[in-house]
Regions:
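Short helix/strand-capping connector loops at secondary-structure junctions
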Residues: 242-258
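C-terminal accessory extensions/subdomains outside the catalytic/core fold
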Residues: 252, 258-261, 266-278
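Conserved alpha-helical "signature site"
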Residues: 1-246, 268, 280
């Protein structure tokens, strides 16, 4: 089986499903300060499916609001632009990739992604990192795997076969068979979609945070990924739990009581958030 170059993988990004226009506009607004909240609210409201998902999640126990919000404008006023932007972006991306042919477990993939997003947000709150960047980075940390499985299906079947035959994790199997891994491809996709550099970096280094990542979003996502694998929220009993780098864990400064809260928050919100974000309409 021939290897895949990063250039070949990047060349396939143009063939991916087109994101809703409002989602691409929201992505481009992540680091802008001159954003028109009213204009963006109007654009989101024009997409009925995204609006419905966003309002359902905003009104769920995930945010614990005392009063029900009925419009995107109200959601922004109550939750803030960053939270609503993260919700709409997440719902839009999942909607664009939700489902596919073959043996790949798309439902399980998104269950793990949503769980990691929730866990990353909870960890970020305790580590005093940007919670919405953590949520989006957690949701998209394995997005490169979708590029590989949908654009190179035959090669990825060989990856799965290799993992099963030598009993290694998927990252090792990808590198052995393809010569690259989903983290590299995911970072390229995040760059292609013009996400902030911090999110690109978190996706690209979620398996191996670098020194400059300590105490920051990449370390948050690295730890969240391992926790959610350990909780087996995707329902993959044979999936290996990735090791947590000790320096990444230490850099977050989370005590045992805080860790218990992270576990509780992730598990308590998971089913509801997963049902809303992965709904077909």
């Amino acid at each position: 089986m021939s290897a895949i170059t990063l250039e070949q993988a990047v060349g396939k990004l143009r063939d991916l499903p087109t994101l809703p226009l409002v989602v691409t506009e929201l992505i481009s607004s992540f680091e802008r300060t001159d954003i028109s909240v009213g204009e963006l609210a109007a654009k989101v409201s024009n997409d009925q499916a995204l609006t419905a998902k966003t309002l359902r999640l905003a009104n769920s126990s995930f945010y614990g609001l005392q009063c029900k919000v009925r419009t995107i404008d109200q959601a922004i006023a109550v939750l803030g632009l960053d939270s609503v932007r993260a919700l709409v972006t997440s719902a839009g991306i999942i909607g664009s990739f939700n489902g596919g042919a073959g043996a790949f477990d798309f439902a399980g993939f998104w269950r793990h992604a949503v769980g990691t997003a929730l866990c990353a947000k909870s960890l970020a709150r305790l580590a005093r990192c940007n919670q919405e960047y953590a949520f989006v980075s957690g949701l998209l940390h394995d997005i490169g795997r979708l590029v590989l499985i949908t654009r190179f299906p035959t090669q990825y079947e060989a990856v799965i076969a290799h993992r099963n035959s030598v009993d290694c994790d998927m990252l090792q199997a990808e590198r052995a068979v393809l010569g690259l891994d989903h983290a590299m491809v995911g970072r390229a996709l995040a760059e292609h979609w013009k996400f902030p550099v911090l999110i690109q970096h978190a996706i690209g280094h979620h398996h191996a945070p670098m020194a400059q990542d300590l105490g920051a979003i990449p370390s948050v996502v690295h730890v969240a990924d391992a926790i959610v694998h350990a909780l087996d929220l995707a329902g993959h009993a044979d999936e290996r739990v990735p090791a947590i780098a000790q320096d990444a864990w230490n850099s977050l400064g989370i005590d045992p009581a805080g860790l218990r809260r992270v576990f509780e928050d992730t598990e308590s919100e998971f089913d509801n958030a997963c049902q809303i974000l992965t709904a077909s309409n």
